[in-house]
């Protein structure tokens, strides 16, 4: 009888190890898919912001807005929502460090490097989008 209990314990431990391995792989894949979706969304959102800023400038003798909220206050609005005020949005924080009449520079940073995104995106006047790997402080 003692042998049967010993085998049952070993069997249970093997089952737990296999289930743990499967869960680990599943969680890693879920994170990869989420990161890919967040990154795709971040670059698309920055392009949307850039298009709104460029359209505003076309309608205002080439002058870009000095306040981001102007893009959502006009009727019709240039943007459906204020992405800067609603940050974080889908795993990314949005900011426009340079927003003046002569141009702009807006960026999207992952809320948690390597967990919600691996890239930092920046878009500047004219719609030039650049990206680089985020640096984790771990």
Locate predicted features.
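Generic hydrophobic-segment detector
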Residues: 7-10, 16, 51, 98, ...
């Amino acid at each position: 009888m003692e042998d049967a209990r010993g085998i049952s314990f070993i069997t249970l431990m093997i089952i737990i190890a296999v289930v743990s391995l499967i869960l680990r792989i599943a969680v890693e894949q879920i994170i990869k898919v989420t990161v890919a979706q967040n990154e795709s969304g971040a670059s698309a959102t920055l392009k949307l912001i850039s298009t709104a800023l460029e359209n505003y400038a076309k309608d205002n003798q080439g002058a870009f807005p000095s306040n981001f909220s102007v893009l959502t206050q006009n009727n019709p609005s240039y943007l459906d929502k204020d992405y800067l005020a609603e940050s974080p949005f889908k795993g990314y924080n949005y900011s426009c460090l340079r927003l003046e009449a002569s141009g702009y520079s807006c960026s999207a940073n992952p809320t948690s490097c390597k967990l919600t995104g691996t890239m930092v995106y920046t878009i500047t006047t004219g719609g030039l989008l650049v990206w680089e790997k985020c640096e984790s402080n771990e």
